[in-house]
Amino acid sequence: MSYLLALDAGTGSIRAVIFDLNGRQLAVGQAEWKHLSVDNVPGSMEFDLTTNWQLACQCIRQALDAARLSAADIQSVACCSMREGIVLYDRNGEAIWACANVDARASREVAELKEIHDFRFESEVYEVSGQTLALSAMPRLLWLAHHRPDIYRKAATITMISDWLAAKLSGELAVDPSNAGTTGMLDLFSRDWRPALLDMAGLRADMLSPVKETGTLLGAVTEAAAQQSGLRAGTPVVMGGGDVQLGCLGLGVVRAGQTAVLGGTFWQQVVNLPQVRTDPQMNIRVNPHVIPGMAQAESISFFTGLTMRWFRDAFCAEEKLIAERLGVDAYSLLEEMASRVPAGSHGVMPIFSDAMHFKQWYHAAPSFINLSIDPEKCNKATLFRALEENAAIVSACNLAQISQFSGVTFESLVFAGGGSKGALWSQILSDVTGLPVRVPVVREATALGCAIAAGTGAGLYDDMASTGERLVSWHREFTPNPQHRELYQEMMSKWQTVYADQLGLVDSGLTTSMWQAPGLERRQRVASSPSP
């Protein structure tokens, strides 16, 4: 049989995942990695090129061993990664510097760039690329020009982290639109670099690598890479892409108007746009999809999964111990407890992530509002359900913003990622949005989407879109409860009002924002999000 290998470089770990041509996962090799903080450089998060390549090779060998396959059984390889992370190379093609996705060292440079063109530069960048300056590559390049001119002068090429992995395997440098689009330097409409943006920023525009679409052949595994990784020299290496967009491919979300909520550490609400366009209010990010010619509106709920982990670890030691004794997941036990709490969680309002406002992106101080001292009504089960309801409310607010500028009317949504493992959470998401929610069998779909790209580039599949639709299968579908939907609409309106007041406390310096975008020096009150 033929098998495909996906290298999936996440924020916290690297995975090598092997699939057969029917999309069945055979084996995975995984290793955690850590990013490097540079002394006296606040917000820095450098990517350890040497150690992380060793870990990638370790994972490939581990996956091959676990699957009991030889290197000759792997017919094609593709790589995907977290977006925004960039790698710079010298003129010999050697990587000389890299940073991870949320490296925030360039706050001052973000603020400087916002001032050029009579304070219109960020709007001009967004109109062309769908990105703001907060996590784009240009402020980071400007920081290097200011503080590490030795690196900046040597830099001859820039790629994303997924492309670095592919280059380590094949010796070929190129970027794909889905991942390179997050640099803020790629034209959303032409799916090619926009050098004029770098010119306007006073940056060099001579380091832009070739652009190749996801699912096209890049090269082949070199002899050196074969010795290091355990793969066979000559194995095709295919262009991969950004993790979220490839995740959508793995979920079969490949047609205009289709919608997905990806529930991980962050929650992304992703909508395939009928035509390429940006949001006049600059609330929503717009990225190239891996499907050629298609763009995705993407909103982000901050730290949703991390908030649930914090709640579990800080307050639920007893439940964790019981779950361990029963051989079940602690979240499953907490969900079972929360299912006995009535919809609305007795009015408790969690204040964590705001709806997305890409241009003025910050959040209130974390808190719970409207608690009761009645232990029958306000307890761990109540707070856990309230957190699940709030995550769904923020998702619904974000989807409403996307619908407002795009004109897309949602018919259903796909719910995937770790959050979708909870049946209660899936039902709450359906109730809050008023939409049928489908949960796939393969919930961690990014690696599968990457494998589909690998197979397409090697000629094993006809095309990515039809293959994504064919390989996805559904675990369960949830339909909305009309009575709960009405209650949640009222809760959403109240939450938006309360959240705006909580932002006011941050603005006045009385509380500390959970997170704010780099370069956001002067916060301005943002109008409340539209209701779905």
UniProtKB/Swiss-Prot annotation:
Highest taxon of source: Bacteria
UniProt keyword terms in alphabetical order: Cytoplasm, Kinase, Transferase
Any Gene Ontology biological process: quorum sensing
InterPro entries: AI-2_kinase (IPR033676), ATPase_NBD (IPR043129), Carb_kinase_FGGY (IPR000577), FGGY_C (IPR018485), FGGY_Carb_Kinase (IPR050406), FGGY_N (IPR018484)
Catalytic function, reaction form: (S)-4,5-dihydroxypentane-2,3-dione + ATP = (2S)-2-hydroxy-3,4-dioxopentyl phosphate + ADP + H(+)
Chief location bin: cytoplasm
EC number: 2.7.1.189
Class in the EC hierarchy, top level: transferase
Stated family: Belongs to the FGGY kinase family.
NCBIfam families the UniProt entry points to: PRK10939.1 (NF008187)
Name of the protein: Autoinducer-2 kinase
Organism: Klebsiella pneumoniae subsp. pneumoniae (strain ATCC 700721 / MGH 78578)
Primary gene name: lsrK
